[in-house]
Amino acid sequence: DNSKISYAIKSNFGQLVTSTPLPYEPEFDVEFVDQGGVNKMIKRHKTILIVNIDPFSKNNSKEMPTPIFDLWAKNQIVYKINATSQKNAVTIINHYTDSIKLGINQFYYANILAFNGENKKANTILKKNHSIKLKLPSNMLIKKSTANFTWLNRTEIKKDNNGDHEIQQGIFVYSYPYINENLFSIEQQITFRDSLLKKHVHGSVANSYMITRKDELANNQAQAQLIKNKYVFSVRGLWRVENDKMGGPFISISTLSEDEKNIITIEGYVYAPNFEKRELLKELEAVIHSFEFTH
């Protein structure tokens, strides 16, 4: 009976992400197979977590599982947990979930970015306006460019049973003066976001503009984290268009400019009615995390 291990994995890796629109999507899709079910199909999966129970294992909950790359397939990441018992396995899973997730996401980002080109046109604008560069898809176009606000996006048409739908992935980069550290709070970040988007991002209907959702179903979340040894303040939430029906999820990171005079925010947003948004948002997350300052 591996139910305790299954529960630990499902509750840690398969929990619903509530900072996306309904219906909520799990952070990771989780499937379980026992040792006898590990066949060629399973070995083709891109992300695999192996839990091995051995009473004589020398491992214990103090040891962080290390990733194995390309074990059975190309562009694959495998984590193996060796535990002495079910209880020990659950302890290791609970203790190292965040580290394993971080490793998986960084691996995802690297694979996504491997397909992105230079996009010199967009990066020339980003360097001029904000002194940064991003690893962008080559089909990401410049929608708007000002001294402190840049909007890039790409659109595609996707079909489902109800016909054709436009899918949009966009990037905003904006900067504003760094007055004090209180600006690194979710309230201040959303205030600045809304004022800039009202000014720069208008819908097709008169008096329509993008704004952050703040209703009871909009579970906007924030966390401080390190990216490339630099402090960043990350916000996840939902956006909508005032006086129109568009909406979707966004993720942003904010950090100090190199001279520490300004805050630079890099945001990705998705518009994909009728379609799941997790992977589309993850593609933008990879782009955001690729930021580098230019000199």
PLM features: what roles do these ranges have?
Residues P26-K87, L197-K261, F275:
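Signature of long, low-cysteine stretches enriched in small and polar/charged residues
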Residues V90-A114, L134, M140, K261-H295:
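Surface-exposed amphipathic alpha-helical segments
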Residues I48-V51, I186-V205, K277-H295:
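Long, compositionally biased interface segments
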Residues K101, N105-T124, R154-F172:
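Charge-rich, low-complexity N-terminal segments
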Residues P137-G203:
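Secretory pathway targeting signatures of secreted, lumenal, and periplasmic proteins
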Residues N12, L16, G103-F107, K143, ...:
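Structured segments of extracytoplasmic/periplasmic soluble domains
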Residues D1-S3, S11, N52, S57-K120:
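Solvent-exposed alpha-helical segments and adjacent loops
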Residues N2, S11-Q15, S19-E25, G117-K144:
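N-terminal "mature-domain start" segment
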